[in-house]
């Protein structure tokens, strides 16, 4: 049994008498090395062989049908790409390399005295399929601290952006400008063999993840804190702690929230706009800086990364109209009026999920523990009790349950981060963990240039035998 197989089996056996054995096996699978690149170098040939054998045996096997509705409907439900790091189940929610969010919260290493998983541990899991040890997570923290410094031209660029340029535009532009530092672009121009691509993609990805909090914090300070300094990286602190320090937040609970936030927003399988964009652009052998910058331009779209902002705007309007504490009956009437006016209740529903988003649930649990009496949280909790039943009565929603965006903005507001335009930047910092872990594997497995076949409406009509008149 391979190490990856042991890791994938572990969550299925959590409730069995063999759970301890398998979890120890998963943790010890790479215990001999704290260097992530060394662990990858051992895993990649095994995975290459496994996939080669699978393709040889099943390469011509049909895995589903494509309907006209799928082609016109944003390719929803169409099985069209391989994405290893996470899988989204409509009933269960996201699993990171086979592990649910509650399992990640339980198993991944935490900061001393902390209760939430460290994003460094999740990144190790996404890259290797293995639950890391504390030593391995500490290695990642120190590695990212070592790589965090920004080149002077990027600092100058950030300091000279106009203040009316959206934070996401600044974020994307700065990431693109980091392309000057790309190990992969340099190696490719020098003719490196394709079997070595992954090594340089890995180096660029580690550098980029390390630098993202510095970019994000610089944008925040320039826009909302009069350009004050972000300070220096402390190599003794974890990635999230350094990030919150650079942002200017010293409350330990906010750092714990950031660890949770950066973990749960990291990946959501490969079909969403940001993940698919990075996969597509990366397939052209664009380096990680260009690929991730493109992904961030997708994340900036209102249908992808702005949803938590829209939730807060809606909640604020609701609070203003209805006042403080609101009866369930008045709340129910307000929701019905919203729906009857042709609007939606933001934060409810999901393109894939058909149950409450587990990312919502873990944020709710955080709020119940740390801010149970906050008026905005109480409003969110009241909506959770009422909205699904109203949506079920209406009969239009495929999923009447809350998603991750229904909660995250309220938590950030509670700790003083009220700048809603900035929230998508936090989302972007987190999403790097998933899409860059996959980008390393995409090059390691030799995935080709993505080039699906497009069709015109006339062509589709001809294909299905429809009249074009």
Curated annotation (Swiss-Prot):
So where does oxaloacetate get bound?
359, 431, 451
Active-site residues, record numbering mapped to chain: 304, 350, 405
Question: Is Transport one of the keywords UniProt gives this record?
Answer: no
The EC designation for this entry is: 2.3.3.1
Which Pfam families does UniProt cross-reference here?
Answer: Citrate_synt
**InterPro entries from the UniProt entry:** Citrate_synth-like_lrg_a-sub, Citrate_synth-like_sm_a-sub, Citrate_synthase, Citrate_synthase_AS, Citrate_synthase_euk, Citrate_synthase_sf
| GO MF annotation terms | citrate (Si)-synthase activity; identical protein binding
Q: Where in the cell is it found?
A: Mitochondrion matrix
Gene3D superfamilies assigned:
Citrate Synthase, domain 1, Cytochrome P450-Terp, domain 2
UniProt GO cellular component terms? mitochondrial matrix
* Biological function: Key enzyme of the Krebs tricarboxylic acid cycle which catalyzes the synthesis of citrate from acetyl coenzyme A and oxaloacetate.
User: What else is on record for this protein?
Assistant: Citrate synthase is found in nearly all cells capable of oxidative metabolism.
Protein name per the record: Citrate synthase, mitochondrial
Q: Which organism is it from?
A: Xiphias gladius (Swordfish)
């Amino acid at each position: 049994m391979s190490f990856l197989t042991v890791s994938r089996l572990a969550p299925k056996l959590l409730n069995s008498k063999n759970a301890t054995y398998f979890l120890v096996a998963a943790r010890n699978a790479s215990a001999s090395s704290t260097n992530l690149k060394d662990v990858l170098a051992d895993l990649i040939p095994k995975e290459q062989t496994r996939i080669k054998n699978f393709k040889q045996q099943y390469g011509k096997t049909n895995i589903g049908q494509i309907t006209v509705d799928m082609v016109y409907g944003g390719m929803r439900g169409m099985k069209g790409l391989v994405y290893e790091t996470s899988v989204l189940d409509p009933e269960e929610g996201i699993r990171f390399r086979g592990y649910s969010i509650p399992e990640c919260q339980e198993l991944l290493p935490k900061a001393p005295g902390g209760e939430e998983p460290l994003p460094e541990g999740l990144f190790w899991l996404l890259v290797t399929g293995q639950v890391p040890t504390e030593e391995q997570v500490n290695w990642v923290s120190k590695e990212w601290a070592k790589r965090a410094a920004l080149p002077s031209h990027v600092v100058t660029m950030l300091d000279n952006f106009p203040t009316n340029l959206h934070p996401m535009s600044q974020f994307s532009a700065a990431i693109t400008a980091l392309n000057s530092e790309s190990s992969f672009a340099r190696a490719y121009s020098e003719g490196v063999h394709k079997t070595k691509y992954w090594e340089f993609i890995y180096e660029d990805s580690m550098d980029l993840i390390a630098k993202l909090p510095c970019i994000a914090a610089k944008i925040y300070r320039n826009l909302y804190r009069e350009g004050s300094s972000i300070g220096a990286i402390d190599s003794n602190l974890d990635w999230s702690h350094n990030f919150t320090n650079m942002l200017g937040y010293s409350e330990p609970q906010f750092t714990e929230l950031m660890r949770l936030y950066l973990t749960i927003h990291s990946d959501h399988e490969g079909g969403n706009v940001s993940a698919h964009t990075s996969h597509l652009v990366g397939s052209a052998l664009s380096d990680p800086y260009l690929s991730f910058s493109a992904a961030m331009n997708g994340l900036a779209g209102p249908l992808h990364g702005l949803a938590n902002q829209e939730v807060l705007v809606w909640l604020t309007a609701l609070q203003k109209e209805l006042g403080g504490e609101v009866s369930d009956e008045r709340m129910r009437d307000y929701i019905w009026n919203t729906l009857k006016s042709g609007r939606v209740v933001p934060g409810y529903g999901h393109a894939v999920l058909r149950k409450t988003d587990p990312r919502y649930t873990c944020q709710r649990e955080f709020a119940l523990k740390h801010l149970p009496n906050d008026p905005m949280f109480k409003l969110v909790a009241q909506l959770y009790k009422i909205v699904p039943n109203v949506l079920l009565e209406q009969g239009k929603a495929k999923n009447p349950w809350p998603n991750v965006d229904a909660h995250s903005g309220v938590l950030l507001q509670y700790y003083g981060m009220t700048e809603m335009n900035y929230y998508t930047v936090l989302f972007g910092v987190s999403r790097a963990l998933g899409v860059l872990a996959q980008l390393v594997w995409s090059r390691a497995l030799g995935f080709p240039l993505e080039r699906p076949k497009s069709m015109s409406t006339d062509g589709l009509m001809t294909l299905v035998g429809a009249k074009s008149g």
